Amino acid sequence: MNHDRKITPIMQQYMMLKNQYKECLLFYRLGDFYELFFDDAIETSKVLNIVLTKKGNVPMCGVPFHSSESYLNRLVKLGYKVAICEQLETPEEAKKRGYKALVKRDVVRIVTPGTILEDSLLEAKENNYLCCIVNVNDNYAIAWLELSTGLFHYNTTDLRKIDSDLLRINPKEVLISDKLVELDLIYSTLKKYKFSITQYSSSFFDTSRSYNTLCSVYGISTLKGLGDLKDEEIAVCGSLLEYVKATQKGNLPKLEFPKAYGDRDFMFIDAAALRNLELFNTQSGDLEGSLISSIDYTITACGGRLLKRCLSAPLACSYAINRRLDIVEFFVNNKVLYKNVRETLRGIADIERILTRVKVGRCSPKDLYALKLTLDKTCILVNLLSKFDTSVVSDFCTRLGRYDDLCKTLSNVLIPNNVSNVKDGGFIKPDYDVQLSEYIYIQNYSNNLIQELRDKYRNITNIQNLKILYNNILGYYVEVSANHLINDKDFIHRQTLANSIRYTTSELKALESKIISARDAAISLEVKIFGQLCTRIIEHADEITMTAHAVSEIDMLTSFAELAIQYSYTRPVVDDSYEFNIQKGRHPVVERNGKFVANDIDLAQMQRVHLITGPNMAGKSTFLRQNALIGILAHIGSFVPAYSAHIGVIDKIFSRVGASDNIAFGYSTFMVEMTETAAIINQATDKSFVILDEIGRGTGTYDGLSIAWSVIEQIHNVNKSRAIFATHYHELSKLDECLENIKCFCMKVEEWNGKVVFLHEIIPGSTNKSYGIHVAKLAGFPQSVLDRAEDLMNKLKANEDLLT
């Protein structure tokens, strides 16, 4: 910013603010635009593809205030932080301090990827988490908060689990110290998944400061009421709040107290399993083809977010799982109710996020009207559910609540509207307030009032061509032709033109003042009434939050009922046993593509490890994944795609399926495979579920076979997990002779007339045939290459020299 010309007062003000927010793009409010100057302007014009201009030698660009959210959205999604500088007074108010006084401006908030509140910038069915990681005395903790809903959780962790934690939480922004980000394990994870990173020095994460921040934000004198918090937990929660305070300039919504995320309450899904099982995205990053795309029948935004949270952290408590299953079964068995409930849900807005915007004063009139309609719908839900005298749904009736008085008030005050900006007005019923009614009458009937006054003056002066006109210089004025002089003391001469004479009157000036000021006065009054409505809603904030949670659950669980009815899912038996018995199980995603061959599996304690051999393309990987997915679906409280299912609670799911090169970070496919397998054998328990596909394939035959053999022995003898292994090493089938709880299966294949048919069916036994040349033929290899491969394979089988 080296510019030689004299700096204007406006630029002095801008530069003073910019120096305070150097890491941000500064949106500086000038009238109806947000302006950017100097380097900010050059960068923003390039990124947003908007015109870059110059005033003197100062580069500048701008975006209209009324459409700024779309520009903000693009910048924030690209990882930029934007400081919003607003005018804190009108030019008229500034002039009262002196004719040349500069309008006061200041930054009112900083918009970052993890602190967004605007509905248009948020994905409806995605949580927008801000996350923080700290290390205090070599003890790690992680916390995540969603400003738009108030959700706030924390947990202790360790370096091995941070990648799984981050994938499960999927934050939009990660707050971290300079020292931590230098650690290879953390740095590689942050870069690999392209999380937006905000770095501070280690002093920002000080435990004592964090303690004081927590007490200050929640208005308490001690943290004892939050439980026995460790130093690292205090540091991570307090640092997160300190950052939010800084970005919101102290204007915080009411947040939930931070809740400990109990590892024992939820199934742990490691990072590899989250990727390999394609819970939220396919390996190529697409939503289509993922599990969530196949099971998400939620209608509301908050229901969709709850489903994602549940899928990333399934329950690990049989009682809680069966409570959900009871509700799903209730709706499956009461189809008329289920359909009525689903239809009612279609009119429900995003209660959680609307309520947060109300709390921080950033809601719109259309938000309040949407909330009014939503609370009406929740009353309908209560009426529907209360007809059934059963404990399964009675809890919902209590939590949904009733808002008759609040809804009546909102109905009496609000006009059905889609007004985004409270300062636009036009959303309060005129008859709600006498003064407002008068202002709006003046606005709506100003032409009539002017015409009435014109007719009155025509009668007084007896000049029938008398007109009342308006321009920006004179305002309203009376005009008569030049040959008509008005000799009435009430008519004050203003202007004589060649063909006309213009007058004004005190009565006309008073009416003009009323007309011009009526709109401003009406808007001011509407803003005041709007504020009163917001205060009334905030008084019910805790109950409305409870209602939002109940709506989310009803939506998610009725969506499970829809899934069960539409695709013939069945209720699983979930208990505290070690069972994993699935009859006629199906893959919840693959079966949507057409005919699917169902398969059985029984990982009883006496055969808790299954070893599957067979050719590629026969369906081994699909079978492995389908059983892991069935286990996950059962643990979120959903029915499952099977004829029957009996599943003992799973504490952790591990998956080593499919290639996932990390060459960009210096890791080969084989190294990634070994690292993920090491994580499994170091963490799996006898309550875990493990699927492993083609362990050892990335190295020499003897190395690979030896590693695969020893891994199976370890999981069988030490971890004692329920596990399914798929392998092309047919030698591993000998393990059933020395390990008592292993059983061999293979993929059924039929051959006739030189043709091979993969039946995708699991049968007992093993096979040493890989059918690789047949797969190559299906892939389109030239016949000459296939013939040569056949010839070489025959030589290998006969132990002949390949060079002869």
UniProtKB/Swiss-Prot annotation:
Cross-referenced Gene3D superfamilies: 1.10.1420.10, DNA repair protein MutS, domain I (3.40.1170.10), MutS, connector domain (3.30.420.110), P-loop containing nucleotide triphosphate hydrolases (3.40.50.300)
This protein's record includes keyword Kinase: no
PROSITE patterns named among the record's database cross-references: DNA_MISMATCH_REPAIR_2
Domain of life, per lineage: Bacteria
Matching InterPro entries: DNA_mismatch_repair_MutS, DNA_mismatch_repair_MutS-lik_N, DNA_mismatch_repair_MutS/MSH, DNA_mismatch_repair_MutS_C, DNA_mismatch_repair_MutS_clamp, DNA_mismatch_repair_MutS_core, DNA_mismatch_repair_MutS_N, DNA_mismatch_repair_MutS_sf
The keyword Signal is annotated on this UniProt entry: no
GO molecular function, one term: mismatched DNA binding
Residues at which ATP binds: 614-621
Keywords recorded for this protein, A-Z: ATP-binding, DNA damage, DNA repair, DNA-binding, Nucleotide-binding
Entry's Gene Ontology BP terms: mismatch repair
Family classification: Belongs to the DNA mismatch repair MutS family.
Record's function text: This protein is involved in the repair of mismatches in DNA. It is possible that it carries out the mismatch recognition step. This protein has a weak ATPase activity.
Protein name: DNA mismatch repair protein MutS
Organism in which the protein naturally occurs: Ehrlichia canis (strain Jake)
Gene, per the UniProt record: mutS
